[in-house]
Amino acid sequence: KISAHNIELVDAPVSGGPRGAREGTIAIIVGGSDHQFERVLKILKFISDNIIHAGTLGSGHSIKLGNNLLNLICRIGTFEVVSMLVKEGVEPSLAVSIIQKSSGRNYATEVTLPDNILSGKMNQGFSTALMEKDSSSALQIGVRHKLDMTLGKAAHTILKRTISEYGSAADISSVANYFENETGARIQPRKEV
């Protein structure tokens, strides 16, 4: 119906969080035809140079959802392993710095833990409610394609437990609190009393 009014639709979700927005490096993931992508490119360049054509309409949204589910899986796996290492007697900051220089590195070891958890800020700027929405939608894509999504479901379950404990408005960093409570391993710096 919108094409009758000479209006075209693309999807262009973003990924990279507040840090990417501040630094102008946020990824803009565009779904639409080649022609539509070329038309919106000059406008989107005002926001970021990191613009990717993902394919047809809807592809950008699907990739963003998949990316956020993968981020959740990596985050939870990283917190689980760091908790285990803390229980083993390794300082969390040392564990993270070594993992970051090794094959287990990921966004959680590069940004989440150093900038938000180990620093004590606990403010990544993305709510558990938004992550729940995106990861739930990504899992629905898996259901549509009859995929088991074992890791995604497990990560989503832990996220839902975190929301149950800390609320849907809590920052996604609160997943670290969940692991601290579950394992007794302190990842965050101790607060001065």
Label for each model-derived stretch:
Residues 45, 189-193:
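ATP-dependent carboxylate/acyl-activation modules
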Residues 59-182:
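Helical "substrate-binding/catalytic lid" subdomain
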Residues 1-72:
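Rossmann-fold dinucleotide-binding core
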